[in-house]
Amino acid sequence: MFELPELVTLAAQANETLVGRTVREGLLGNRPHKFVWYNRTTEEFGRLTAGRRVGQASTRGRWLFIPLEPGYVLLLGEFGGSLLFHPTDETLPEIYHLALRFEDGSALTARTAMWGAMELYEAGREQERELVRDMRPTPVDSSFTFKYFRGLIDEVLTGKKRSVKGLLTQDQLIPGLGNAIAQDIMFRARLHPRHDLAALDEEQRRALYEAIGATVRAAIDQGGRNDEVDLHGQPGGYARIMDRSAAGQPCPRCSTTIVKIQYLGGACYLCPACQT
């Protein structure tokens, strides 16, 4: 699944590559997929996108906003798979779930490997969409300060019991983060995924906050994770410290063997000595 660093990369590349191109034809999926969420029929999507120009893209959390001007915004979110630019539309993949063919002969395609939203809104209405409307600050927002982070933890603790992994990956409490990047955040913060959020002292809260910022910045600076591809089909440069290849290997910090556990619906890789 794309997380914040990959979407920041895709937005930047879209602005370098797509801005100003005029849509000749808009197409929805050529292969049915019950977990792709559309809000337009095939006919509506084609009619409303034809003749519109690509504007400046932006991202928030795990959502990508691509203006089709005048008047509309293409919203892609909560998905993994690929978003690819094709210099010629003769190179379109065999399967796609959305395509924009441009007047200059190039194209953009989106394909999801799991699930995702591919929706077209009248400009401004995309901000009313569920999961976008009430989105909290993300780690790249100026409002994501340590003061805000402390308040977020205190707010979360008034509800159900949470763990550190739960804070990072559940209910988009910190938009843009997912299970992949959370592994390295917890390693940098020296915290076990099951660590009770209520038990964090001030020093641990600070360490977790700083680990979020450091990990997200590192992944953005390197164009996203190396197990995801960018707009041009190239893998990102960020190699995770804690992923499936780390299991059974020595911890890079203390040499203890890295272990794998299943927790909160996904695999976790951790150092049983460093992360408590």
Which positions does each model-derived feature cover?
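Low-complexity, intrinsically disordered regions enriched in charged/polar residues
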Residues: M1-L4, N39, R129, S143, ...
